[in-house]
Structure formats: C-alpha cells, structure tokens
Amino acid sequence: MATESPATRRVQVAEHPRLLKLKEMFNSKFGSIPKFYVRAPGRVNIIGEHIDYCGYSVLPMAVEQDVLIAVEPVKTYTLQLANTNPLYPDLSTSANNIQIDKTKPLWHNYFLCGLKGIQEHFGVSNLTGMNCLVDGNIPPSSGLSSSSALVCCAGLVTLTVLGRNLSKVELAEICAKSERYIGTEGGGMDQSISFLAEEGTAKLIEFSPLRATDVKLPSGAVFVIANSCVEMNKAATSHFNIRVMECRLAAKLLAKYKSLQWDKVLRLEEVQAKLGISLEEMLLVTEDALHPEPYNPEEICRCLGISLEELRTQILSPNTQDVLIFKLYQRAKHVYSEAARVLQFKKICEEAPENMVQLLGELMNQSHMSCRDMYECSCPELDQLVDICRKFGAQGSRLTGAGWGGCTVSIVPADKLPSFLANVHKAYYHRSDGSLAPEKQSLFATKPGGGALVLLEA
C-alpha cells in the first residue's frame, strides 16, 4: 500500500453536494470547470504526542474532514489560488518563483510549501500555471492538522499537474520536509497519516524508514473529538520549536553522560538505539543523568564542554537563540514514557482483552498528565475539557495535536455516546456568559477515514 501512488477515483460530481458546490464556485471564479480534484484528510493523534520528531512511533488515524482542491492547469505560468472561505484572501503569483514568508503564517503559504516541495524534488523550473479553489472543513488551529492537510493536498495537486508518479511514502516525506519552509519543525506524522491512512483502521506510523502498520481499534468504543475553541497557531508560536530544541539538547546531554559521540546525536530515540536498552531503562538513565531544575545555556555548555558561541551557532536553531531556560529532564521523561505508552496501546489493541477500552483509556489519561505536567503543552481550557469528558463517561481523554489549545480526543463506550455528547455539550459549550460560540464541528464522534486521493469527474 505505502509503495503505491495515491489512488485516482472517478466520481459523479452531481452526486456529491460538496464537490458540486466547489465546481460551481470554481466556474463563477475562473469562468471554466476544474480538470480534477484532490482531497487530503486531517488527522487525530490517538496517542504519541510530541514524539515523532524525537524518532518515535505514533498512533494517529485520519478524520473524515479534509482539504479539497479543485484544479485546472493553464497555459500561463501563473498560480491563481482562491479559497471558498472569504476569510482567506486570494493569491496570484508566478508558479516558478515561489516566495514563502516565514514571519507570516498566511493560509496560502501552506499551499506554496507543498507546491515548492514537489517542484524542487523534480528540479522543475517551468511549472505550468494553475487555477486552484480550496475548500476545507477541518477546524483551523485545532490540532487536527488542517495546515499539513493543505500542504499534502498541494503536493498531490502539483504532482498530478506535472503528470509524475511518487509513492505515498515519498509524498509524505517530501511534504514533511517542505513544511519547514514555513518554519515548522514537525516530525512527519501529520503528512504520513494524510497519505497512508486507510478507512476503518488507525495506523502505527514508524520513522526511519517510514512505514505504517494497521491498528484495529476496539469495536465497542468510539473516539470523540472535542475542540477547546482555543486556537493555537503552531507556526506563529515559539513554544513548539523550543520543545524540539529541548529534546535535542536532552539527547545530547544523555549521550554525553553515557560516553557516546554526542555531537552527532539529534534525537532521543538515537540515544536509546545506540545504548540498545528498553524505554523503561532509558527513563532510569534520564533520572541519573539529568536534574529536574531547568538548565541555562551556560550549564549546558559546561556539560558538553563547549562555548556559548558553539552552542548558538552549532546547536540552537535561529528561533531558540534567546531562550534562557531549558527543561531537559521533564521533556525527556515525557518522550520516553509516551513512546512506551504507544507500544502498550498497540499491544492491547492486538490482544483485545475484555477490559481493553478501560486499559486504553488509562493510557490516554496518563498521556494527558504527561503532556500537562512534563511537556507543559496543555492549557486551562484543555484540562477543563478533559475533566468534563471523563466525568461524563469517557474511559480516557487527552489533548491531541501540538496542544496549547486545539482539541481533545476521548475514548467512549459506544452505548454511552448519546448521553456523553449531550452532557459535554452542555457542560463545556453552553457557558452562562456566552463566551463560546462554537461551530457545529466542536464536538463529534469520528471513525478512521481514508487517505489523500485524486478525483476525476466521471
């Protein structure tokens, strides 16, 4: 599956209200009809938060919400980009001179990332122009990867316009790399699941090499997504990139402590691999090697035997140069314990004991506690929402996505779903002060959706 290209499917546009509406809007915008459509889904990460960029496996599933783009290649060399949502302004630019401004996370920059990634992969300097109309129903800045879905969708659009072929794995790797044009140092989970997802199954996504394994979720439970309605724009915040750097520094200090060649080490997983020990043993090494008090740059330099100048020029990224404290112990503890929870989650799904929903729920609860206390990527609203979800019948509930806002994911016994939805809606969304005006997408049950594909009108 992963070595195949994304599927191309013929559809009767008239039978799909959303496609039909997009086709009509495209016609009124550009005065022509689309040649093809591309869709790429968002995702919910069930467990395994902030560990993909440390080299560890994660366990997401695609959601049914997606980014859908109507496309018409044109003879000019101009990219005309529009969005069905009037909040997002149009863009007209040369298809062969793509400029991405890292300082402004504008919506169209995510499209340009995907386009530029494919363009550079093939070394294309004369890309034909295209008219594109984008429609997305993934709530933005909610931790469901609306931005990565747009990058992936744009990558597949560009590939299709070029008439070239790439496997799903290659596409995922190119799109993950290209998102860095906008300054997001993610680990590749979002792009991988967007391409590798299959209907009806979650996936264990492993890295180096990238591969996906089916994980059958319990039939007696439903996964429910609840949006805290606190928006977190990942590329606009330094939180995320500081955590990436804290993990990198923790890996280097652990490697140095164990007399490994620390200067070559970038990820916490590499330390474990080089030592050849279990995740549980890595947690013990972390206890011995690192202290819970925050590290300042001077102490890190002393531990590694380098100068401040070397730390700044050789290790720190441009956006972490001015950080004064780094919590290395807490971040490493989270990563190693969360990586172990992912493997336990998969094992429970495979063995399917009678109390599996309860066991999976406990792992999700532990994950949230670690995200909140050790990784510090929660926020008061997420913690409140998690408590409400547990109170009204979720066996487990946790933040999902980068955190600092966005969504929670809860595992709910199927027979409790109607009362769960009603009670959570009342407790969280019906504020007496009327401060939350949620869209209908704020609370919904979801099942594993399929991956990115090309749609042709039959």
UniProtKB/Swiss-Prot annotation:
Entry binding sites for ATP: G143, S145, S146, N233, K234
Catalysed reactions, as listed in the record: N-acetyl-alpha-D-galactosamine + ATP = N-acetyl-alpha-D-galactosamine 1-phosphate + ADP + H(+)
GO molecular function: ATP binding; galactokinase activity; N-acetylgalactosamine kinase activity
Presence of keyword Phosphoprotein: no
EC number assigned by the record: 2.7.1.157
Binding site for alpha-D-galactose: R43, E49, H50, D52, D190
PROSITE patterns listed in its UniProt record: GALACTOKINASE (PS00106), GHMP_KINASES_ATP (PS00627)
GO BP term, example: galactose metabolic process
This protein's UniProt keywords: ATP-binding, Kinase, Nucleotide-binding, Transferase
Active-site annotation: D190
Listed GO CC annotations: cytosol
UniProt site positions, description: Transition state stabilizer: R43
Subunit structure and binding partners: Monomer.
Family: Belongs to the GHMP kinase family. GalK subfamily.
NCBIfam families per record: gal_kin
Task performed by this protein: Acts on GalNAc. Also acts as a galactokinase when galactose is present at high concentrations.
Protein name as annotated: N-acetylgalactosamine kinase
Organism listed in the record: Pongo abelii (Sumatran orangutan)
Primary gene name: GALK2
